[in-house]
Amino acid sequence: FIRAFEKVQAELIAEAFTGTAPPIAIEPAFNEYDSDLILHTFARSLTPEQLAEAGWPELKSDRRRFQFFLERAARAWVEAQIEAEEMTPWRGFHGRITGTIANIMRTEGRSKTLIVSTSGGVIGTIVAHLMGLSNHIGIELNWAVHNASITRLIYSADKVSLSMFNGLPHLDRAELRHLITYR
């Protein structure tokens, strides 16, 4: 199951299975949240003074300021302090992801190996949900997720357990470490 954006990536992953890969299914529920929309909606909720204090004009060139602003915007989104007609509310994002995971478990059944290719926001949300952590922690986990990392879930008919989070065993070699990135 993949988000719509990653069909080519899924095809490359499937090649590694040498003929045993399950069919690729595009699942829009695993699409990442729209961070640009969240950022701009949050920015519109601030006064000009608050924007200046946050360093709005320099965000594109200052990574630290950008990260700080993005974290504030994401917290406001999770707390339902910002909304826009075209923006999925946090509750909808969370429900879409957790509902889809539950549906996959039901429809696929036990003892299956499935691969879901998605992004940090989705992964952080799933991990926080499984661990009984707050929505804020789910967003915080998002910032920690490496590109190309592995998060492994083990599931049965009645529960899901986290087996690995943010693993990079496939990149843990000196000649590949430069490939370890965020966002």
Language model segments and positions:
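Beta-strand elements within well-structured catalytic alpha/beta cores of enzymes
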Residues: 1-2, 112-118
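Phosphate-coordination/substrate-recognition cap region in phosphate-metabolizing enzymes
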Residues: 1-67
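Short aromatic-enriched loop/helix-cap "lid" or pocket-rim segments at secondary-structure transitions
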Residues: 35-41, 128-129, 165, 174-177
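A mid-sequence, solvent-exposed acidic-amphipathic segment
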Residues: 83-113
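Domain-level recognition of soluble alpha/beta enzyme cores
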Residues: 134-159
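Acidic, His/Gly-rich catalytic cores of divalent-metal-dependent hydrolytic chemistry
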Residues: 160-183
